[in-house]
Amino acid sequence: MNNYSNLALSKSKGRIFKEANSLYRTPFQRDRDRIIHSASFRRLKHKTQVFVNTEGDHFRTRITHSIEVAQISRLIAIHLCLNDDLAETLSLAHDLGHTPFGHAGEDALNECMVNFGGFDHNLQTLRIVMFLEHKYLKFKGLNLTLETLDGLLKHNGAIDDLSTVNRLIGLKSFKNKINFTNSGSLEAQISAISDDIAYNNHDIQDGIRAKMFNLNDLIEINFFKDIYKSHKNNIKNNNKDILIYQIIRDSIDLMVRDLIKNTKNNLKTNKVKSLQDVYKLEKPIVCFSSKFLKIEKEVRFFLRSKMDNNKKVLLKNNHGKKIVTKLFYKIKKKPKQFLNADHLKNDPNRAIADFISGMTDRYAINLNKIF
């Protein structure tokens, strides 16, 4: 096993607001714990991944997805001798900013906010951990390490448009402690691609459970067909449930193996010897080989055609959009009925967006009934 510990973010440069160090935990372990104990993290258990949580007890929610992403991230980071605590922290936090009703809710809220700076769930995650969580006397937010903030900012890669960050968060809030021009750390890159691995595979499992497609549909993709062939004769009584679990398990394993191997090749090819080398590279270092990029593209196309374009999903998404839109304009008429004056005084529209984005599916549905 190669040791890339010299490329790890092993030490923190601190936080926006100074704090004494813990006797028992590293700064990144404290970040992880602050996220786990936050109200925003708890609410993820009632937020849609693909299926509204009232549709079944075994479908994934945002919280189960985040835990699965964290598990994959830790595995990769440990193997590469990087900071697994940081990779886990970023993974647990990456979806905090999601609205109720998944991406449909986000689209609706973004449309409502189009003349007021827009809405972006990734940047909303930063708003939550920097301003909206209230647990400390001396500062707003969770006061996470600079490395965690940087990783959350760069979940989708280097920042191209600082104006959006400035509108939704305010560059001054970072007190010149974040380098916006650098690429993300290896830990941030690991978290981002672990997100892809998790939802591509687990959405397949949920899609089959929801009877949107079946095993025969899945094995039309050669990647899954090969895995299926390697197991079909070993499963007693042709138990399809066990077979599907095994296929998904092997799929994740093969993707992780390819990712690790290709990342090592990228580090060698690009002569990455230091953290500065990581920051300077404009393209991701942690990524799949061309073969697995093609497989990932096939899987995404399959999921779009079978799930995203499914009539039931489209109807649910449309219903979720209508609820979010209705809530926005109803609350806007009487904002003081729902929000305190301090939150409303700076930017009432942003305060309403903060409020709605923090709702669970259940809370939004129940509030909509009142209106």
Task: List each model region and its residues.
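Conserved short loop/turn motifs at secondary-structure junctions
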Residues: 92-93, 110, 344
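Broad structural signal for hydrophobic residues in well-ordered alpha-helices, predominantly aliphatic
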Residues: 76-77, 109
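Short coil/turn segments at secondary-structure boundaries
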Residues: 56-64, 93-100, 113-116
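Post-HEXXH active-site segment of zinc metalloproteases
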Residues: 89, 100-117, 208-216
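Histidine-centered, transition-metal-coordinating active-site segments
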Residues: 1-66, 70-76, 84, 118-123, ...
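His-Asp-centered metal-binding catalytic motifs of divalent-metal-dependent phosphohydrolases/nucleases
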Residues: 80, 84-106, 125, 195, ...
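Generic hydrophobic/packing signal
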Residues: 73, 80, 91, 97-100, ...
